[in-house]
Design a protein with these regions (language model features):
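Hydrophobic beta-strand core positions in alpha/beta domains
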Residues: 4-6, 37, 85-86
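Proteins that catalyze or organize thiol-disulfide redox chemistry
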Residues: 1-3, 23-27, 89-92, 104-116
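Active-site-proximal beta-strand/loop segments in catalytic clefts of secreted hydrolases
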Residues: 7-8, 38-41, 63-64, 99-100
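Conserved hydrophobic/aromatic "anchor" residues
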Residues: 7-8, 49, 57-58
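Alpha/beta-hydrolase fold active-site loops
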Residues: 2-3, 33, 82
Length: 116
């Protein structure tokens, strides 16, 4: 199944704005796709964010600033956040996006069936 990897941080305003939309999309897609957040942040900051923002129930991994290096390996040349990668069902990179997401475009892509 397709996988969405979203690199984000609690200190990144566009990242914070799109988290509820990603959570809603994860619930909507259910088992048809996986959404994972990788935080360029520390555990305490992420925990505080999730306590203040109910409903963020997709997996969130903490990588600290190593997340920025990892995102560069996935094609984030400038190292900015948010950065999102979509993998198809075979694990190949299908799409990369720097900056705030167009959640409707992401939804359409994931529901199109082209990634399975």
């Amino acid at each position: 199944k397709p996988v969405v990897i979203n690199f984000w941080a609690t200190w990144c305003p566009p990242c914070i704005r799109e988290m509820p939309d990603l959570a809603n999309l994860a619930r909507e897609l259910g088992d048809d796709a996986t959404i994972i957040g990788i935080a360029a942040d520390s555990g305490p900051h992420v925990q505080k964010f999730t306590e203040k923002t109910p409903g963020i129930d997709f997996p969130l991994l903490m990588a600290g600033y190593k997340a920025l290096n990892l995102s560069k390996q996935w094609g984030n040349e400038k190292g900015g956040l948010p950065f999102t990668v979509v993998l198809d069902a075979q694990g190949q990179i299908h799409w990369r996006h720097s900056g705030a997401l167009d959640i409707e475009a992401l939804r359409s892509m994931l529901k199109s069936g082209d990634l399975h």
